[in-house]
């Protein structure tokens, strides 16, 4: 399965590059003015979902390439807290898994939580409308959204143990549909066979 890391903000700033995001996380960029000269929000307040989350590990290993995160970054207790904090704090930038930022009332998963703005991210040196993508499942699957990582199931129990049954369920059609509906891109897409007649 594939999951994306999203950044959500309440400012009018809509796009960022991976390089800018790295500089925010390492503390080189500290103010919204560094990103958008017209911004009046002052210093960035960057929040993560949990001090031990996979999102923080991904940020250190893959985005910052082993560099330390800035000491000014804060970790809250849950993804819901990050969304609530960002929606109420104008200068906040929240970093959470893309599956948490989806609009739960939209069964198509084509919209995001309306209380925050989800930023589009570009792998290029300059973010434009044409090269920046939001973490929609299609862009995660095609790897056009650059902040993606794979999710694996690792088991070391005997083949007949309970964890093996869970793994088989999750990798089967029903399990992959559950993963799809949770906002994560499944490893295998459910197949639908359609028989089309040439004659009427």
Predicted regions and their residues:
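Exported/periplasmic ABC-transporter solute-binding proteins
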Residues: 10-200
């Amino acid at each position: 399965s594939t999951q994306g890391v999203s950044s959500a903000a309440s400012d009018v700033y809509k796009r960022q590059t991976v390089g800018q995001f790295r500089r925010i996380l390492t503390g080189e960029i500290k103010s919204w003015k560094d990103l958008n000269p017209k911004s009046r929000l002052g210093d960035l307040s960057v929040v993560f979902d949990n001090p031990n989350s996979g999102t923080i590990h991904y940020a250190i290993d893959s985005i910052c390439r082993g560099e330390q995160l800035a000491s000014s970054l804060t970790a809250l207790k849950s993804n819901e807290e990050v969304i609530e904090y960002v929606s109420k704090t104008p200068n906040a930038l929240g970093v959470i898994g893309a599956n948490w930022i989806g609009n739960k009332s939209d069964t198509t998963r084509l919209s995001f939580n309306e209380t925050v703005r989800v930023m589009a991210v570009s792998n290029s040196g300059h973010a434009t409308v044409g090269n920046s993508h939001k973490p929609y499942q299609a862009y995660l699957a095609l790897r056009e959204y650059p902040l993606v990582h794979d999710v694996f199931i690792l088991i070391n129990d005997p083949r007949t143990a309970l964890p093996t049954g869970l793994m088989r369920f999750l990798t089967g059609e029903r399990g992959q549909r559950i993963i799809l509906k949770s906002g994560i891109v499944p490893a295998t897409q459910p197949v639908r066979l359609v028989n089309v007649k040439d004659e009427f």
